[in-house]
Amino acid sequence: AVHGDPDIWYNFRQIEAMVSNFPQYNWFDAMTAYPQGKNIDWGPLFPLIASALCIMTGAVQRVDCIAVSSWVPVLFGILMVPVVFFLGRLIAGWKAGIIAAIFIAVVSGEYFYRTMAGVVDHHCAEIFFTTVFCLFYIYTIRKASEHEVRLKSPSSLKPILVPSVIAGVAFAAAMAVMPTTLLFAMIVALYTLIQYTWNAFHGKSTDYLLVVNGVVSVFAIASLAIVGVHSPVYSLATYSAAPTHAIALLFFGTALLQIFSMLSREKPWVFVGMTVAGAIGCIAVAALVSPTLVNSGFSALSSFFGQRFQDFPIEEQKPWSLLQIW
């Protein structure tokens, strides 16, 4: 049975329109926010995958499109099992990988709902692509810890280039599903700051982070360029120029930390001082040059760590709880 969630039926509408005009995506819907209409803030990749599957199976009528695309969340759920196994094995060994794979196959709550047959929503694709991104990003970091990476030695970059590219492609795919997956860029930015600081106090090189963050940034910006700018609102949660600017800041921020680490070699507190001064300076410059970007950033943080009254009806934006997990 198909769920009654209006988002699911809206996805069916987008998929049906895409099947008829493949691969054209319906970026503006006159019937949403009637009578003005509305620019669609959801990405095109999930409907593209579903509509391509419909066309390949010969499902072009409405009922057939619904029947075929209803299985797309299940397919993503199946693909998550090996991804979670490898992620668990990478972090804590093969036994942890098996346990994680078993749990991801039987866990209930929000995850089960998002990967259930008939719940045709983009969240299953968000989960899959961001998990693949985490898998290869962590794998790249693990490889860098086993083989010293130096920017002055191009041959030392070989072990991390391929996993960095795969991580970049996965993140690019996630951004093409939904711009709010930009959240993972914020996680990467926080990790990068912590890792650079840790390595500064322990006398270790952090060249590999410049490489992997650079590759991820290039692929993410390329993905956003292919998708294009379709929102008149400058916001990190829409397909405006804001997500592209934020991804560029991730790379330039990493490059700035790399410069600070090179200038303050064996002087960790100098690195900390330069980082704090640099952060204050960057925020001040951004506030002067593009106050809209700064406001959008603070709004995104407020939405993530708090909850605005207008977001209350949105299930996926509610604070997580043990009840939702299980």
Question: Where in this protein do the model-derived segments appear?
Answer:
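Transmembrane catalytic cores of multi-pass membrane glycosyltransferases
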Residues: 126, 163-166, 170-326
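Active-site lumenal/periplasmic loops and adjacent helix-entry segments of GT-C-fold
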Residues: 1-91, 95-103, 107-131, 149
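Membrane-embedded helix bundles of polyisoprenyl
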Residues: 72-90, 95-197, 212-230
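Residue-level recognition of short, well-ordered coil/turn positions
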Residues: 22-23, 145, 201-202
